[in-house]
């Protein structure tokens, strides 16, 4: 099925809400503390990521949309870290600084793919003057196609009714990720996106689909909403609108590692898609696909356009895992956070045959993820001669990506993938044939990083060159 992504580059969105910084400390756990019955984590990696409303803005920016973020911060290192990180991904920050309060920060300690503890550093922003937030919203209304109110009950949205009114008067849809059980404060919003627990805390426990629909429609009527989207974890999503049949969408998640920030991804994709001019039903379709991608990553994460396109088209149609170098680096970083062993190989793979398939399957068995780096058409021509490749790069990558053993496919322009390998630094570099390990491009860089290099045998009798010669011989008869 041909699926066109929304014109995200034309979308303008403002996000207003509770901004926070997510800190992650990673390290191995090898012993119990003598001071208390708790594990000792030897921290070797520290990461900082925008969270809360800032993660919503990150998700919108990652799609290529134009986004402005408004929220409350302190005047501290956390606020500066947020501004710097967000500016690097093209999020325009317009924070209101509150000297008496720290920027909300959440610290998570992780070891062996498990979160051991979370520490929150915060003081609520309730009671502050909301006028600076209102002024920023008013200034942006003429240039945005959607307003997102990201509520984590930290004080940025105490005047949410005024914000809704300002946007609706300007004809701008208001999307809200709600918090708590007081949905009266969201009266008049275009769309609420509660998860199932949040929905049932307000509407009551639902024993069936029909009951969920009935109670959801009552909430829409009670609070003058235009629509309600209930996110239901492994059961997918349900969109409810007045005078329309319910739209149930099954989950698209293949693996679930972490649901942190998944709600931010959903509302971010919804807003960007609506602001690009698509319908609400289309926006939900793309948001559901994006949620299936992001829960397969560790921590608050975003979804790139190519990941979203792969998700909505499906593996068989797109060559799942065909990536740019930057997208591959991000995918590898996420895999390593999950403790996965990354294997990498390379080749032309012009006419895929049984030998290739067997070799790649064996390579995949040596780790958790397999990267295949493919020579570009120009690189192949220099290596194999003017008559090659038989199949252009795009087709070769699609075929490789369709193999169950292959996770990610990337191309390179040079004669060898040495530069690419040095940038990825796989845990294991493999090559087929009769090479010596030290002859393999990238081996020195992998060894220097503590990785391994291995040579695997090809299946006897399988050769692209022999296949081409046989075809030529048969055609001459």
Swiss-Prot record:
<feature type="binding site">
    <location>
        <begin position="195"/>
        <end position="198"/>
    </location>
    <ligand>
        <name>ATP</name>
    </ligand>
</feature>
<comment type="similarity">
    <text>In the N-terminal section; belongs to the carbohydrate kinase PfkB family.</text>
</comment>
<dbReference type="InterPro" id="IPR023030">
    <property type="entry name" value="Bifunc_HldE"/>
</dbReference>
<dbReference type="GO" id="GO:0033786">
    <property type="term" value="F:heptose-1-phosphate adenylyltransferase activity"/>
</dbReference>
<keyword id="KW-0418">Kinase</keyword>
<dbReference type="InterPro" id="IPR002173">
    <property type="entry name" value="Carboh/pur_kinase_PfkB_CS"/>
</dbReference>
<comment type="pathway">
    <text>Nucleotide-sugar biosynthesis; ADP-L-glycero-beta-D-manno-heptose biosynthesis; ADP-L-glycero-beta-D-manno-heptose from D-glycero-beta-D-manno-heptose 7-phosphate: step 1/4.</text>
</comment>
<dbReference type="InterPro" id="IPR004821">
    <property type="entry name" value="Cyt_trans-like"/>
</dbReference>
<dbReference type="InterPro" id="IPR011914">
    <property type="entry name" value="RfaE_dom_II"/>
</dbReference>
<feature type="active site">
    <location>
        <position position="264"/>
    </location>
</feature>
<dbReference type="GO" id="GO:0033785">
    <property type="term" value="F:heptose 7-phosphate kinase activity"/>
</dbReference>
<keyword id="KW-0511">Multifunctional enzyme</keyword>
<dbReference type="Pfam" id="PF00294">
    <property type="entry name" value="PfkB"/>
</dbReference>
<feature type="region of interest" description="Ribokinase">
    <location>
        <begin position="1"/>
        <end position="318"/>
    </location>
</feature>
<dbReference type="InterPro" id="IPR011913">
    <property type="entry name" value="RfaE_dom_I"/>
</dbReference>
<dbReference type="Pfam" id="PF01467">
    <property type="entry name" value="CTP_transf_like"/>
</dbReference>
<keyword id="KW-0808">Transferase</keyword>
<dbReference type="InterPro" id="IPR014729">
    <property type="entry name" value="Rossmann-like_a/b/a_fold"/>
</dbReference>
<dbReference type="GO" id="GO:0016773">
    <property type="term" value="F:phosphotransferase activity, alcohol group as acceptor"/>
</dbReference>
<comment type="pathway">
    <text>Nucleotide-sugar biosynthesis; ADP-L-glycero-beta-D-manno-heptose biosynthesis; ADP-L-glycero-beta-D-manno-heptose from D-glycero-beta-D-manno-heptose 7-phosphate: step 3/4.</text>
</comment>
<comment type="similarity">
    <text>In the C-terminal section; belongs to the cytidylyltransferase family.</text>
</comment>
<dbReference type="GO" id="GO:0005829">
    <property type="term" value="C:cytosol"/>
</dbReference>
<keyword id="KW-0119">Carbohydrate metabolism</keyword>
<dbReference type="GO" id="GO:0005524">
    <property type="term" value="F:ATP binding"/>
</dbReference>
<keyword id="KW-0548">Nucleotidyltransferase</keyword>
<keyword id="KW-0547">Nucleotide-binding</keyword>
<feature type="region of interest" description="Cytidylyltransferase">
    <location>
        <begin position="344"/>
        <end position="477"/>
    </location>
</feature>
<comment type="function">
    <text>Catalyzes the ADP transfer from ATP to D-glycero-beta-D-manno-heptose 1-phosphate, yielding ADP-D-glycero-beta-D-manno-heptose.</text>
</comment>
<dbReference type="InterPro" id="IPR029056">
    <property type="entry name" value="Ribokinase-like"/>
</dbReference>
<comment type="subunit">
    <text>Homodimer.</text>
</comment>
<dbReference type="InterPro" id="IPR011611">
    <property type="entry name" value="PfkB_dom"/>
</dbReference>
<dbReference type="GO" id="GO:0097171">
    <property type="term" value="P:ADP-L-glycero-beta-D-manno-heptose biosynthetic process"/>
</dbReference>
<protein>
    <recommendedName>
        <fullName>Bifunctional protein HldE</fullName>
        <ecNumber>2.7.1.167</ecNumber>
        <ecNumber>2.7.7.70</ecNumber>
    </recommendedName>
</protein>
<keyword id="KW-0067">ATP-binding</keyword>
């Amino acid at each position: 099925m041909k699926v066109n992504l929304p014109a995200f580059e034309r979308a303008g969105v403002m996000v207003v809400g509770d901004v926070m910084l997510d800190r992650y400390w990673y390290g191995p756990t090898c012993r119990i503390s003598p001071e208390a019955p708790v594990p000792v984590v030897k921290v070797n990696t520290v990461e900082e990521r925008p969270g809360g409303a800032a993660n919503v803005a990150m998700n919108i920016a990652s799609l290529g949309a134009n986004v402005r973020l408004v929220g409350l911060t302190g005047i501290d290192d956390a606020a500066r870290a947020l501004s710097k990180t967000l500016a690097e991904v093209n999020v325009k920050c317009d924070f209101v600084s509150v000297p008496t309060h720290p920027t909300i920060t959440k610290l998570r300690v992780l070891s062996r793919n498990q979160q051991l503890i979370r520490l929150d550093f915060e003081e609520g922003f309730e009671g502050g003057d909301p006028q600076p937030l209102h002024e920023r919203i008013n200034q942006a209304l003429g240039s945005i196609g959607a307003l997102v109110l990201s509520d984590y009950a930290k004080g940025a949205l105490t005047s949410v009714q005024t914000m809704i009114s300002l946007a609706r008067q300007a004809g701008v849809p208001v999307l809200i990720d709600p918090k708590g059980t007081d949905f009266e404060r969201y009266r008049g919003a275009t769309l609420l996106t509660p998860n199932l627990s949040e929905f049932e805390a307000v509407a009551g426990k639902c024993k069936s689909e029909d009951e969920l629909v009935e109670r959801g429609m009552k909430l829409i009527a009670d609070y003058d909403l235009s629509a309600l989207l209930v996110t239901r974890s492994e059961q997918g999503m349900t969109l409810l609108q007045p005078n329309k049949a319910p739209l149930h969408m099954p989950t698209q998640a293949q693996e679930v590692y972490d649901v942190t920030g998944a709600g931010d991804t959903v509302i971010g994709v919804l807003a960007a898609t609506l602001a690009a001019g698509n319908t609400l039903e289309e926006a939900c379709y793309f948001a559901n696909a994006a949620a299936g991608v992001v829960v397969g990553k560790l921590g608050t994460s975003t979804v790139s356009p190519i990941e979203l396109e792969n998700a909505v088209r499906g593996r068989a149609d797109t060559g799942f895992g065909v990536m740019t170098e930057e997208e591959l680096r991000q995918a590898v970083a996420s895999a390593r956070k999950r403790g996965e062993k990354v294997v990498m190989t390379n080749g032309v793979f012009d006419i895929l045959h049984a030998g290739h398939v067997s070799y790649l399957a064996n390579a995949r068995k040596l780790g958790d993820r397999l990267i295949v780096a493919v020579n570009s058409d120009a690189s192949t021509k220099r290596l194999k001669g003017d008559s090659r490749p038989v199949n252009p790069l795009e087709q070769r990558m699609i075929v490789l990506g369709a193999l169950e053993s292959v996770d990610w496919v990337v191309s390179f322009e040079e004669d060898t993938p040495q530069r690419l390998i040095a940038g990825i630094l796989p845990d294991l570099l493999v090559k087929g044939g009769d090479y010596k390990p030290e002859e393999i491009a990238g081996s020195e860089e992998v060894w220097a990083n503590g990785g391994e290099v291995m040579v695997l045998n090809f299946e006897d009798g399988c050769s692209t060159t022999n296949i081409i010669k046989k075809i030529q011989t048969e055609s001459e008869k």
